[in-house]
């Protein structure tokens, strides 16, 4: 996937949010995707931070603005502003801690309570490099994703497994929604956003599911 300088022209700006319990690896997934870095000593995020990455998606230059927030309960008052304008989300759990997977349903309810119903959501089972400690079976996560019409992948921010694939898939699905609206509207629709505006995914139909997991 080709990279682009932050100051280059882009066709779309998509806001993505990372959600899930504290310690599941949200910040390291973000730094792995945007900077190809991993910090073994990363501390829990305090408040909100975001990073951007500009990349090519189906021939268009897309700038992803990716927001990361603390998973701790005491920081959840920020949710309304955090979710506002988001068109994609990565719902992340730790494959070695079943409780983080159990809490995914609550995070999903919160997300859907603050965003458009057709937001593109990818369920992420992170830390799949720790195969000997796995507490959440892939089949269990797939079943949840199917019930909730989510995409699904297992990732490792540590060794970069599926990190690029996961973010790119979410951006690709958002772009497909925007492209479909443009075609259905007879070309350049007046309600399609310009540079720097938020993409609204309101008019999309059912979300298809794509499964992915760590290779053995």
Curated annotation (Swiss-Prot):
Sites where the protein binds GTP: 20-27, 68-72, 126-129, 156-157
GO biological process: cell wall biogenesis; protein transport; response to auxin
Annotated Gene Ontology cellular component terms: cytosol; endosome; extracellular region; plasma membrane
CDD domains reported for this sequence: Rab11_like
Lipid attachment locations (S-geranylgeranyl cysteine): 213-214
Membrane topology qualifier: Lipid-anchor
Keyword hit for Ribosomal protein: no
GO MF terms, alphabetically ordered: GTP binding; GTPase activity
Induction note: By auxin.
Keyword Transmembrane annotated: no
Disruption phenotype: Slight increase of primary root elongation and lateral root branching and hypersensitivity of root growth in response to exogenous auxin.
Motif (Effector region): 42-50
Keywords from the UniProt entry: Cell membrane, GTP-binding, Lipoprotein, Membrane, Nucleotide-binding, Prenylation, Protein transport, Transport
Domain of life according to the entry: Eukaryota
Localization terms from the record: Cell membrane
Record-stated family: Belongs to the small GTPase superfamily. Rab family.
Purpose of the protein: Involved in auxin-mediated response. May be involved in vesicle trafficking of components involved in polar auxin transport. Binds GTP and GDP and possesses intrinsic GTPase activity.
Miscellaneous remark of the record: Plants overexpressing RABA1A show reduced growth of roots and shoots and smaller leaf sizes.
Official protein name in the record: Ras-related protein RABA1a
Source organism of the structure: Arabidopsis thaliana
